């Protein structure tokens, strides 16, 4: 199974290298291990995360693409759909099948036709438009709902930290 996963990851890396999505850089951390990738995601334009540069790690299972990777930001993040430890909570990264909580349709969840590029683009969209109905960070979700101005201030501080300011 790992051979199939490796071939798929190599093909996806080649595609990302030849035609990278705007504002995203991603690839294996080293040539010996194609199952751990690092990514740099630029904050989406016209959002409170604009100008930020956010590093993340994608960890792929040996049965990829049957199972989704896990994604974790390695910098400080404050967002309704990112756990305090950096783990990303987004439908496309959830295993196939029905959502026991009833928030997601099976079509929104992982399937083998998804790709690293689709994951990263979904995360950029998530940064721009948080889903506060299934919050991974309760404090960020509450602030997003109740005090948007304060949320923007905190996000701007995160952006400055991401730039080393």
UniProtKB/Swiss-Prot annotation:
Active site feature: 89 (glycyl thioester intermediate)
One GO CC term, this protein: endoplasmic reticulum
Catalytic reaction equation(s): S-ubiquitinyl-[E1 ubiquitin-activating enzyme]-L-cysteine + [E2 ubiquitin-conjugating enzyme]-L-cysteine = [E1 ubiquitin-activating enzyme]-L-cysteine + S-ubiquitinyl-[E2 ubiquitin-conjugating enzyme]-L-cysteine
Chief place of localization: endoplasmic reticulum
Protein family per UniProt: Belongs to the ubiquitin-conjugating enzyme family.
Pathway membership, UniProt: Protein modification; protein ubiquitination
Domain UBC core: 4-164
EC number(s) on file: 2.3.2.23
Keywords: Acetylation, ATP-binding, Endoplasmic reticulum, Lipid droplet, Nucleotide-binding, Transferase, Ubl conjugation pathway
Species per Swiss-Prot/TrEMBL record: Bos taurus
Protein's name according to its UniProt entry: Ubiquitin-conjugating enzyme E2 G2
Acetylation is among the record's keywords: yes
Physiological role: Accepts ubiquitin from the E1 complex and catalyzes its covalent attachment to other proteins. In vitro catalyzes 'Lys-48'-linked polyubiquitination. Involved in endoplasmic reticulum-associated degradation (ERAD). Required for sterol-induced ubiquitination of 3-hydroxy-3-methylglutaryl coenzyme A reductase and its subsequent proteasomal degradation.
Gene Ontology terms, MF aspect: ATP binding; ubiquitin conjugating enzyme activity; ubiquitin-protein transferase activity
Subcellular location: Endoplasmic reticulum; Lipid droplet
SMART domains to which the protein is assigned, alphabetical: UBCc
GO biological process: ERAD pathway; protein K48-linked ubiquitination; protein polyubiquitination; ubiquitin-dependent protein catabolic process
UniProt entry tagged with the keyword Kinase: no
N-acetylalanine PTM positions: 2
Subunit structure, interactors included: Interacts with AUP1 (via C-terminus); the interaction recruits UBE2G2 to lipid droplets. Interacts with ubiquitin ligases AMFR/gp78 and RNF139/TRC8; recruitment to lipid droplets by AUP1 facilitates interaction of UBE2G2 with AMFR and RNF139, leading to sterol-induced ubiquitination of 3-hydroxy-3-methylglutaryl coenzyme A reductase and its subsequent proteasomal degradation.
Recorded name of the encoding gene: UBE2G2
């Amino acid at each position: 199974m790992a051979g199939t996963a490796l071939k798929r990851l190599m093909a996806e890396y080649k595609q990302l290298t030849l035609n990278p999505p705007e504002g995203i850089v991603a690839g294996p951390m080293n040539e010996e291990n194609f199952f751990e990738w690092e990514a740099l995601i630029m904050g989406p334009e016209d959002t409170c995360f604009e100008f930020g540069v956010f590093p993340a790690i994608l960890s792929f299972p040996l049965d990829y693409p049957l199972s989704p990777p896990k994604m974790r930001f390695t910098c400080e993040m404050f967002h309704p759909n990112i756990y305090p430890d950096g783990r990303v909570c987004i439908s496309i990264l959830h295993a196939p099948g029905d959502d026991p909580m009833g928030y997601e349709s099976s079509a929104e969840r992982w399937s083998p036709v998804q790709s690293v590029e689709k994951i990263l683009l979904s995360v950029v969209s998530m940064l721009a438009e948080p889903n506060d109905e299934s919050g991974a960070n309760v404090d960020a979700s509450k602030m997003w709902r109740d005090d948007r101005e304060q949320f923007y201030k905190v996000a701007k501080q995160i952006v400055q930290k991401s730039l080393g300011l």
